[in-house]
Amino acid sequence: MTKKKKITLLLAAAVVALALAVLAGMIATRFLNLDTHREDLLHALRTALDREVLYREGSLSFRLQPTFTFTGVVIREKDGASDFITADRVTFKLAVLPLLKKNVVLRRLEMENPRIHLIRDRSGIFNIGNLFEEKKDRIALKARRIIIRNGRLSFTDRQILPEGLTTTLENLDLRIDHPERGRKAAFRISATVDDESKSGKLALAGTLDISGSTEPILSSRIDTSIRAERLNVGWYWPYYSRYVPFRKITGQLDM
């Protein structure tokens, strides 16, 4: 290679590097301050979740991939009267290429100290049921991995008892990979189970074969190992009473 060709290649490489640096600078300038795009961001999240979404502060870093961090996150229920999820911090890493197809794919979604409220009403409808519905006007939002650290999940079941039977998972740690309709998702869960002023421990690990978009979400199949300590079996009597030929069981279950 002649000296002239080497100089030409070096100049071309320098121009490309400069162009990439300028482009990165433009992107960083545009997005590092999320508050300037607060309304656009909230609109996208509201559309994807079909709920009001608020946050106190947000930041964005460009290391190996775009990483968004939000603090003071609040996701309202559909009626706006109560909170569905609150979290001290939510971090997610965004996959860039799916955006070209108008899809939002999160490589990793991590919630710290979230408080999650699940409800099943008297007709058997869950408050998260709408999140599994396919809608053409909804932004496609997928997460390849979801992680919960030190969470709290309360489940109130008004179908099993009209006044509501509430079970709470404290100190909840969860990891689930590829939680998508029609796919098999691997998961791990550990938590403290609080009910009727009693406390037990629960750990599960296995796979969830999630039903397709044309099937009810409750038709999903689960294959899991279970470890339990001091579970209050009497608290769950309404769920299994119809299947056993004896009176209410009391005591604690280890397995």
Residue ranges and their predicted role:
Residues 246, 250-255:
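Short, intrinsically disordered, charge-balanced linker/junction segments flanking boundaries
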